[in-house]
């Protein structure tokens, strides 16, 4: 590329930066004026409102005046918010106005037009022509999808065809061109090398400048209700999904808001890691939660829900034996649709018998016993649904409570509590008596009426929580109804081996008030079938990350909970860590969906790690040969044979070397939290190190110790596998955990063993890693 072209491009950058500066100055001035107007409006709100309550017409006039003033204030606040958003985008553009250029000549046109692509659009000073096109604009799709030559894009007026004569990429920092490349179809390796060769961060970065064609298919898909993305570790699937969110918010900005979209992330740490991507693109963050928090909120306080990571920890630390086999058999069966069918049969059985009800009590007095409720319930016609019959029971119970309340308020304790009411309650009673014209100084029964009202107030307040519980059908003892499943004899059902042991274990946990993680969704499914629960219609798009860890039953539950939703489903079967996901269907299984509504895309190219780390890691998992490492070279992974007592000094030496190389994030990765705590105890007095736990919501640069199941989706400059021995990694179910740990490293990977190395390394060619012994 000739020097004069670079000079011309830099001159254009300078001109664009000047326009941005002028716009920032102009909007900042307007923003100050609008802000002052908002402050004045708030201060003088009631002075500008005409208040007159003498006549009905005056009341309406007052309401209209208040509404008008409130709408004026709301409009000013909205304008102020829009200006803030504009300023944020302009400030980002000022540093790096754009990252791409295409020259496109439409059919029947003589000249090509130069289109510059950035994270936001920018008009010229006269607001007539685009200086920068937003990367989400229809015309910008050609930058990601085509090489120079015939190309097209879909506009609102139909398909536009033409010829792309140039495709150019830029690296611009602080308004200066640092790199400039003319490229073919894919975003050029020179740009990717520059981006991927950088340091890891405690927050995920936007990939908008380096989106690949296959990622662009994910981002711009608008036709399929369920979009499944199976992507190798480091393939950019989560990044692409977040760019997809930004694209959809832009594309449907008149009908879709960020609070209409929800992201299920694997843990709070990952939520923090990705939290800066959407704001970087000028969009508000979507609603974020974890599946565990979502389920826990719906279960409520009646049961103590097991954390899924505690379930994983238990399975990984349990010795091989009958107890482990029973737990895993139970986890896998309860995740299946066969178990849901068993629950459906149980629900059908409950129409005839088996419902268990709680006593309705007040102040240790049984108003209606559970047995009496059961008799009433089963006396109703059984041709009705469970919910219809329960609603009739509810209405009957509310009548019984009302009758009880009327009797109970005559008791002495009610008057004693009435004497503790505050002055406002007495004033309210006086006002009510006056309104009924039942209060005057000349009558002798005023105090009786006052006492009756006081008693009524006290009783209504005390009985209100009970009435609310009855209205919510909480008189059903759902825990016991669910536990009864595990007391039944099953002859026609397909139950797993060890069913008797599974039943005993489940009964014991529920009797103690615990809900094992594998029972959470089945329990909620049964409970909500009995009590009825409306779906969430506000959320219109779900993004589910690490979908390989979701079972078919969990998918079915989410579909019912969010009936209007489209879903973007991301995962990698090679990174499955939960027992339910291994050797079973998961949310990534295409056949679980209506074939007319689903599309599955596969990302095979891995960008995170060096070629050496990926060549090593992909050999660990079946089918790993399909994964394509990005051509970025680095050191070979290193396996070190050491003693337990020698581990600390090796780790400290490696950390020093990482720092010397300029690395900023490095992790010691353990298989379990138990292992991580042991490592932390070993190192905490010798290095500045932080232990990451389930309660950790963010991490900073530096040295951390983290279990594999919390490191999912996160990347580090360098990673050390704390124990890669055969004693620690030998079960076939641990292969994907081992692979997940190895693929966290961007630039360097070290594996420590005291004793024989993991048999998983037998599948890796010795040319793909160094083997050293401590002291060599």
Predicted regions and their residues:
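Phosphate/oxyanion-binding active-site loops and adjacent basic polyanion-contact surfaces
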Residues: 203, 207, 237-241, 393, ...
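Alpha-helical nucleic-acid-binding subdomain
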Residues: 249-542, 549-557, 565
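Short, flexible loop/turn elements at secondary-structure junctions
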Residues: 106, 233, 265-268, 548, ...
